[in-house]
Amino acid sequence: MSLQAQPPEASEPETPHLDFAGTTPYEDYVQADVLTHLQHTLSDDPGEMVFLVTTQVMELWFTVIVHEWETAAKALRGDDVPTAVAALKRSVRELEALNASWRPLAQLTPAQFNSYRAALGEGSGFQSAMYRRMEFLLGDKSASMLVPHRAAPRVYAELEKALHEPSLYDEVLRLLDRRGYAVPDAVLSRDVSQRYEPSAEVEATWTALYSGDPEAELARLGEALTNVAELVWRWRNDHLVATRRAMGAKAGTGGSAGVAWLEKRAQKNVFPELWTARSHV
């Protein structure tokens, strides 16, 4: 009786390449040394490091999400809905990761926050230029939000460009118009540097789309946008709750009304007609 051939023994793993002429290829690509030396705390409280790193991580997620939404907007301009939907779906996973960034800060007590709050000076999240670009892409625009960045020419120029470009939602509505759906001229020709305001006609268009085949391309686009909008709403509410726990109703570090200002922001829906149309389907 012949013996079955035995599988060859797994070879021992090769020793990884450890000797490099300069810095490692990983470092050259990721620049981890740069990233991990950007933390310059201004107090002796150990909690400040957590606050600072968490905020920096949020900024990185803002950057990725802006990239995705700009990719989606460009695809929509070219009538490439699948590419736009793919970018929006990626941004949903990234928004989930962004929202999870609140966890290290979600249960700060006033005493803990006060231990290093003075180090923030007048610094405040609403001064984030990359977050502002996110808001502009969502259609929530205000020229006054450029003012804090007047002393930073590159940042100011990027924000000014974003202010005057169509938002992601503007590109969606222009696509619907090109596909033969009723989008009023007042919406299509509006001043895109202004905050988007809801339209009854746009609501009727989404109602018609949602009354049809749920697997249709534009219906799937609508759901991808709704997923984005929901997570933006959750981000705003997580910010509100974390702030309320850490400082109550005190004024914000940047001179805002703090919780009252965040409450007003949290009440706003992104892509409003995608929500109101559901009442008519």
Predicted regions mapped to residue ranges:
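Surface-exposed peri-terminal alpha-helical interaction modules
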Residues: 2-281
